[in-house]
From Swiss-Prot:
Listed name of the protein: UDP-N-acetylmuramoylalanine--D-glutamate ligase
Cell division found in the keyword field: yes
Native source organism of the sequence: Lactiplantibacillus plantarum (strain ATCC BAA-793 / NCIMB 8826 / WCFS1)
Pathway membership, UniProt: Cell wall biogenesis; peptidoglycan biosynthesis
GN (gene name): murD
Subcellular location: Cytoplasm
Positions contributing to ATP binding: G119, T120, N121, G122, K123, T124, T125
Subcellular location, principal: cytoplasm
NCBIfam families: murD (TIGR01087)
Amino acid sequence: MKSVEQYRNQKVLVLGLAKSGVNAARLLHKLGAFVTVNDKKKFDENPDAQELLSDGIKVITGGHPLSLLDEDFKVVVKNPGIPYSNPIVSGAQEKGIPVITEVELASQILAGELIGVTGTNGKTTTTTMITMMLNQRTNAGKAYVAGNIGVPASAIAQKATAADTMVTELSSFMLCGIQTLHPHIAVITNIYSTHLDYHGSRENYVKAKMRITMNQTANDYLVINWDSEEWRQLSKQSQATVVPFSRQANTKDGAYEEAGKLYFKDEYIMDAADIRIPGDHNVENALAAIAVAKLQAVPTAGIVQVLKTFTGVRHRTQYVETYQDRQFYNDSKATNLVSTEMALKGFDQPVILLAGGLDRGNTFEKLAPALKAHVKTLIVFGETAEKMADAGRLAGIQDIEFTDNCETAVPIAWQHSQAGDIIMLSPACASWDQYPNFEVRGDRFIKAIEQLTGKAEEN
């Protein structure tokens, strides 16, 4: 951890708690700041606020009073999920107070190297692959995973040494709140239209993603998907050295797939079929990770070892178990239709799909071809249940069932299944209409499977 004096004896507002807010507040307190924490949850229902108060940090809960702006704050550190339309946030900006996110704070104290990974889909898997590959090196420091993957970057930055690397998953929400964050290697897996309710337009969403490279120089690297003309054009905005990856062999200047084999420049790495986790999208993720690993001098044998053994990340096309010749997969992280489409394309077997969730105003017609090609039974729930069913009807699916939630969908899926089927939760929607987050949704799905198979009694 670098020595930082800029916050000592300065007033700082931490807006919104959860993991990132709690860690930011504690770090700022450690750095000598006068920290005020503000969270909308009531104090008696807010264990995070209670703990921070016991640590000597000022806590204001139960709402976001505008009177907070009367304080002479040097900076506001906001939870990434709080929109910039929030009156406290917009008011701070109007007063010229910098508004940053916890990952920006973490980057300011990080002694080691930063690798940032963003994109619409594949961030978590790619971040994890890269971290595992870097830890195959024997003559380098430790690689830590951090960020939107569930581990606050500020917690990792405090323990990482100058020899270490922090591989950080960066959401568009986080990237809106950076100013000086400077990854030596930035990765953009892909960019599709999502989170438009937060950003207001696709243009704003793309701008947020491209902020990952705004502080890079020619001595840094931008690893970017080369299989879209839009993405190729976006790379021209960066000052970094561009290292492309491609499943369509659109380039041989980086990592690419050709005739079922994976290469980095002219070096053969492995056969795509030997990657442990299924799906063409995971080949893309692997190529991005290979590019980073090669830039960081990871031996090819170490890269292959990871890709042959890595079984995936929890809630991302996560294999749960096989019961009476039916395989269960938890893809709760699939919060947009592109993620669900990619997950479906990873299977040759018939799929019973559990889908639905928060209604952000979009429709699902574009999912129909994948539904038609892969889904035998569609079980829908949540605010988008009817819209999802419409996509199923458009795809010609005859077997469509409505239910309350993903837990009640499990026994229904079982009733409609046969030996050899895949039963998969891949909602194509955010979870917030019924669950606090996608992790809880996925855990409830797994619990329902355990109830079905009898493992719940064993536990």
